[in-house]
A protein has these predicted regions:
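N-terminal secretory signal peptides that target proteins for export/translocation
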Residues: 1-4
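Bacterial N-terminal signal peptides
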Residues: 9-18
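Short beta-strand segments
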Residues: 121-123
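Active-site-proximal alpha-helix that buttresses catalytic centers in soluble enzyme cores
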Residues: 26-114, 127-129, 133-141, 146-156, ...
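Signal peptide processing junction and immediate N-terminal pro/mature segment
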Residues: 20-25
Length: 175
C-alpha cells in the first residue's frame, strides 16, 4: 500500500510511526528513506548546496521525534551530508553502503536492525529500489529534480511491508 501526503512537521512522522502495527515480541522495523538533498552540481560526487544544507536541517527537524537509531548513506558525500545534522544531534555514526546494492542494504537492515527505526539517504535512482527491496510496493520513480520525498516503510513481524509516501520541507519544483 502506498499513501501520499505532505509532511509539515515531525509530529506527522511520529504519528505514522505510532500507527505502525505493534508486535508483542518485537517492534516493527521502520525505515525512513529519502533522497539526498539538493547538490551544487551534476558532478559524480557533488556536495550539498546551501539549499540542500537547509533541507538537511529540515529533515533533522521532521525526524526529531521518530526514534531513529541507525543511519545509512551511500558512499557519496551528498548522501552522507544529508544525514550529518541528524548524526550530530543523536551522536550516531553514519553507516556507509554501496549505492548500487539496494538488496544488500535491505538484507543488512532486516538482519542487523530488526525492530529499530532506520534512516537511509539514497539517490533519485536508488530510493524506490530500496523501498522495494524492503518488501514494500515500489513507488513511481523519483525525478532528478525531486528532493522532498520521504518514504516510511514499516515491516511487521511476519515480513509484511507497507509504505507511506510523504513530502517534507519546501516543495521541489520541476525546472
Amino acid at each position: 500500500m502506498i499513501r501520499s501526503s505532505r509532511c509539515w512537521g515531525g509530529l506527522f512522522v511520529a504519528g505514522v510511526l505510532a500507527g505502525a502495527p505493534e508486535a508483542p515480541a518485537q517492534e516493527p522495523t521502520t525505515v525512513l528513506v529519502v533522497r539526498h538533498t539538493e547538490k551544487v552540481s551534476e558532478a559524480s560526487d557533488a556536495v550539498l548546496s546551501d539549499l540542500g544544507l537547509a533541507r538537511a536541517i529540515e529533515l533533522q527537524r521532521v525526524t526529531a521525534e521518530a526514534r531513529v537509531s541507525v543511519l545509512f548513506a551511500s558512499q557519496y558525500a551528498r548522501a552522507q551530508q544529508t544525514l550529518e545534522p541528524i548524526a550530530d544531534r543523536l551522536g550516531l555514526e553514519i553507516l556507509v553502503h554501496d549505492a548500487a546494492d539496494s538488496d544488500g542494504l535491505a538484507k543488512r537492515i532486516l538482519t542487523d536492525h530488526a525492530g529499530e527505526v532506520i534512516l537511509v539517504s539514497g539517490h533519485s535512482n536508488t530510493v524506490t529500489a530500496i523501498v522495494a527491496a524492503l518488501g514494500a510496493p515500489q513507488p513511481p520513480p523519483v525525478e532528478d529534480w525531486d528532493y522532498d520525498d520521504l518514504f516510511v516503510v514499516t515491516i511487521g513481524r511476519g515480513g509484511d511491508a507497507r509504505v507511506v509516501h510523504l513530502s517534507y520541507g519546501a516543495p521541489s519544483t520541476e525546472p
